[in-house]
Amino acid sequence: MINFNVGAWRPTTGQARAARLASANDLVTRTLAQHGLTSGSGTASSHGDGSETMRSALSGLMARLQPDGGPATPPADIPAGAAFAEDAFTCAAGTRRYHTYVPASAREGITGLVVMLHGCTQTPEDFAVGTGMNALAEQHRFVVVYPQQSRGDNAQSCWNWFSRGDQMRDRGEPAILAGLTREVIARHAIPADKVFVAGLSAGAAMAVILGGAYPDLFHAVGAHSGLPAGAAKDVTSAFSAMAGREAGSAPRDTPTRTIVFHGDADATVHPSNGAAIVRQALEGGPAQSLQTDAERAAGGRSYRLSTTYDADGAEAVEHWLIEGLGHAWSGGQPAGSYTDPKGPDASAEMVRFFFSPSS
């Protein structure tokens, strides 16, 4: 799900662009060698300028990194009285388009906002279908926002969680996403203490960054198959972090309530990253807490659920480790991409966690 290619870096000019391209080419060549996708010499073929060969070989690497089946963008089924509208937000850090789902049930009073960050190669429409979050919004009367990554800022539509310029408050993509969220809050008069963010893969990694950078804005985080904030500072360290090697972690002063889902068969983002998100979420938390572990089954898959409570008995962190699940949204809808219909319903459990009375 999280893929990188030569064109994924933000476009620059002159020497800066050339330097980035050379660095990316070198990284790709070394990565291709690691995955057995190079010639016998251990380097990409050098006929011509090598760019076509590099793109072709990189496509093979992307195929290795992605689950079977490409992304799908089936049409969303919108109930009468509901709205699924596209808009755009612009600030000094840049512009992003987004879709907002306002359920028909909102006329009875809006309960909150869930910001959903898609994974690489996905679209807001696809992610909405795959997670089934709009149906839950109808049931619980909350608004859903689906920001869309620009292909001009990442060629594979990945959120740039591995870029230093996109990991801090009021800079880069966090600034854009926070501003976008505030705009929706004001437009729909959403309760300020019921704003949450969730994501899949690269989207989950960015959701974790947002939870740490804006604890005053996002009151809980849902991370599915993601990585901790600060896990990488560039593409090289991103690959290491995804493989479960040498992952960094940004210190956190304010704990953010977090629910984590990860498959123990995830070959794209190593499951150790889920545990790292949990540790990071608990940093700066209360001195005393209780933890419970339970082994259960749902939807044809076994899973281990670890719950950490704060000193007041409120759920602070949940960690769902799902047996046999790969790099896909647990309990998702088959019509969407990167979903697995088996296992516990990640969307429903995130909504329960977000809107629990103790939140």
Could you describe each region identified by the protein language model?
Residues 115-121, 225, 262, 323:
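The conserved beta1-alpha1 loop
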Residues 185-187, 192-254, 267:
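Primarily recognizes the serine-hydrolase "nucleophile elbow" in alpha/beta-hydrolase
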